[in-house]
Amino acid sequence: MNTSFRIDINSHTLISNEMTTKGSCCVANFLTPQQLSELKEQVRTDAAKHNGQYFAHHGGSEIESSLLGVLGAAPEFRQLLASLYQAGAGKSAFNDEVLKVLRCVQGNSGRRESNCFHYDASLVTVLLPIEIPQNGTDRGDLIMFPNLRPVRSNVLFNVLEKALLQNALSRKLIAAAIRRHLLKPEKLQLVPGNLYLFWGYRTLHANEPCDPASRRATAIFHFGDPHAGSLATRLILKLNQRRARRATVLGTQRAV
């Protein structure tokens, strides 16, 4: 396993500036071809276990025993995350926990997980595409409204915003407005092996639908919850993890 990653400690300020001014920053060819191939093989194995339907891992042995676990524990990667949080929040993160997610959108069940606009709980979001359709219209592109809001000083404002936007009706209205060109989000066609960084807490984002015959697999690293330690934050995290487990189970059951 090749555990050397392309991280330049001198680029932290540049990355932070691009996240703020452009909405996101892309580190091209972050993974070597060998590393990308290794992760793709892991995804294929997992996809077969879930009968070609949607699944997501929130931490756990599937991630920690893989290259994703190695990356999440790499000192230079953790230093990058801490530096970005400091730049974005003006202070150090409450703790150094890195939440790692492996998400795979595939099959008919995957469409239910598209256009689910949301704000992340963490300030810093790092997206590592593993397998992404590169042709056609339904590629599962990342759509985002960058830096719509600041870091809220009160957790209740954060909860209220999430309640207003992260529900089925609001998401349908946003998706409809985009189709009618009333709203014009940024759109990123993700390239496997590149690394994408943005202010997830401040950016309303989702993925577009993915062709059921294709697979969209991404690793996501979350760092720095501005409201860490609050009861509301703990409840939101538990609800999100429960929802992900339920979506995985439903996708597998419906394929049987």
Describe each PLM feature range.
Residues 1-79, 83, 194-195, 227-256:
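N-terminal auxiliary "cap/dimerization" subdomain that precedes the catalytic jelly-roll/cupin core
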Residues 58-64, 95-104:
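Short, glycine/charge-rich beta-strand/loop segments that flank catalytic centers
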Residues 213-228:
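A short hydrophobic beta-strand segment most commonly corresponding to one strand
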Residues 118, 205, 222:
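Histidine-centered active-site/metal-ligand motif
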Residues 106-195:
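Catalytic core of non-heme Fe(II) oxygenases with the double-stranded beta-helix
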Residues 203-211:
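Short beta-strand His + acidic residue motifs that chelate non-heme Fe in jelly-roll/DSBH
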Residues 87-100, 140:
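A short coil-to-beta-strand element that immediately follows conserved catalytic motifs
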